[in-house]
């Protein structure tokens, strides 16, 4: 009876693992398409604006990332990745700043300037009126970043599923004696 339940669990984990592998392959193809699309749009923008107008000389001297990768780990060891925009705050940042007691009618205060200004759009480095292909390139690369975070989560889930499958197979081998 226990052997039958264990086999059903192995089948379930295996089907889930195969589904995750299919999703990973689809996301890889989509990522490749987005990156290819982004480079093609970037080359179109270089052609439209001139090769010297879109290049490393136009980059800002001090670059700030517009997105970051957030991670979390569940109790069973499964990691999840997601994209975090640079202007947003995490709950830890909000809570620590507003932890002090508040007065209802206190002394008028001047608002504190934000320590981190809103990130500037990198398209502004290339001028005010940039070609549409440059905006398309930026959008393609942003979609690619989101796909990369999704792929990292899927890869983590696949690795976790493989370890679960190996554990279940070991248990199954211990329960079933080998036939002579």
From Swiss-Prot:
Intracellular or extracellular location(s): Endosome; Lysosome; Endoplasmic reticulum-Golgi intermediate compartment; Cytoplasmic vesicle, COPI-coated vesicle
UniProt superkingdom: Eukaryota
Main localization (coarse): other
UniProt key word Transit peptide: no
GO cellular component: COPI-coated vesicle; endoplasmic reticulum; endoplasmic reticulum-Golgi intermediate compartment; endosome; lysosome; vacuolar proton-transporting V-type ATPase complex
Keyword line: Coiled coil, Cytoplasmic vesicle, Endoplasmic reticulum, Endosome, Lysosome
GO molecular function, one term: unfolded protein binding
Region (Disordered), start-end ranges: 89-123
Coiled-coil intervals, chain numbering: 13-38, 152-176
GO biological process: cellular response to increased oxygen levels; intracellular iron ion homeostasis; lysosomal lumen acidification; lysosomal protein catabolic process; vacuolar proton-transporting V-type ATPase complex assembly
Pfam families given in the database record: Vma22_CCDC115
Its job: Accessory component of the proton-transporting vacuolar (V)-ATPase protein pump involved in intracellular iron homeostasis. In aerobic conditions, required for intracellular iron homeostasis, thus triggering the activity of Fe(2+) prolyl hydroxylase (PHD) enzymes, and leading to HIF1A hydroxylation and subsequent proteasomal degradation. Necessary for endolysosomal acidification and lysosomal degradation. May be involved in Golgi homeostasis.
Subunit structure: Accessory component of the multisubunit proton-transporting vacuolar (V)-ATPase protein pump.
Name of this protein: Vacuolar ATPase assembly protein VMA22
């Amino acid at each position: 009876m226990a052997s039958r339940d264990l086999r059903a669990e192995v089948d379930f984990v295996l089907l889930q693992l195969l589904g995750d592998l299919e999703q990973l392959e689809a996301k890889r193809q989509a990522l490749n398409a987005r990156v290819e699309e982004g480079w093609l749009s970037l080359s179109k923008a270089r052609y439209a604006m001139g090769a010297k107008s879109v290049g490393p000389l136009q980059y800002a001297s001090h670059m700030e990332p517009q997105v970051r990768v957030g991670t979390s780990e569940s109790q069973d060891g499964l990691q999840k990745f997601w994209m975090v925009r640079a202007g947003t705050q995490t709950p830890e940042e909000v809570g620590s700043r507003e932890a002090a007691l508040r007065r209802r009618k206190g002394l008028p205060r001047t608002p504190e300037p934000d320590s981190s200004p809103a990130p500037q759009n990198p398209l502004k480095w290339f001028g005010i009126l940039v070609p549409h292909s440059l905006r398309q390139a930026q959008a393609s690369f942003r979609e690619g970043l989101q796909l990369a975070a999704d792929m990292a989560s899927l890869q983590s889930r696949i690795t976790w599923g493989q370890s679960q499958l190996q554990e279940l197979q070991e248990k199954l081998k211990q329960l079933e004696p080998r036939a002579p």
